[in-house]
């Protein structure tokens, strides 16, 4: 099954399920749906960022959260976050804490976004089908990049940065 065959729950502005549609239908018709973003910190407080693969249908080649993905139909947010961490970074058995909810809007491609964070020093092995590269950055480096080159980041990551990351010490 290709990613275009994936089925997502279509939701309303209150994040209540009102139907189902394929990934292609959801994106082509700006239907509200769900996604997760995960911020992976190491024990020194650095944040792992990924650069999205050029083959991605949304924001190819841009820097993004450590891991991210769509919530599949019938799946809950936390299960999706665990699945995406494993699929994209080969991480499992980490404690995930929800830190932010962003309501669906054009900037998020009509996705309600739940943001989770975890702290781990486990080895990260990126999935080259999803991610072209990734690395840990000090928060001061993330801030500098966001100020100098905000266009190299996804629009959703920019919202996460403004509403959560930039408020960290």
What role is predicted for each listed range?
Residues 52-54, 83, 135:
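Short, cationic motifs built from Arg/Lys/His that form the positively charged side of catalytic pockets
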Residues 2-37, 43:
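Acidic, metal-coordinating catalytic segment for phosphate/diphosphate chemistry
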Residues 35-67:
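A glycine-rich, hydrophobic loop/mini-helix early in the fold
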Residues 48-49, 66-98:
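The catalytic Nudix box helix
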Residues 24, 61, 73, 100, ...:
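Nudix hydrolase/Nudix homology domain
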Residues 29-31, 58-63, 137-138:
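A short, polar/proline- and glycine-enriched secondary-structure boundary/capping micro-motif
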Residues 38, 67, 98, 116-118:
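A structural signal for short, well-ordered beta-strand segments
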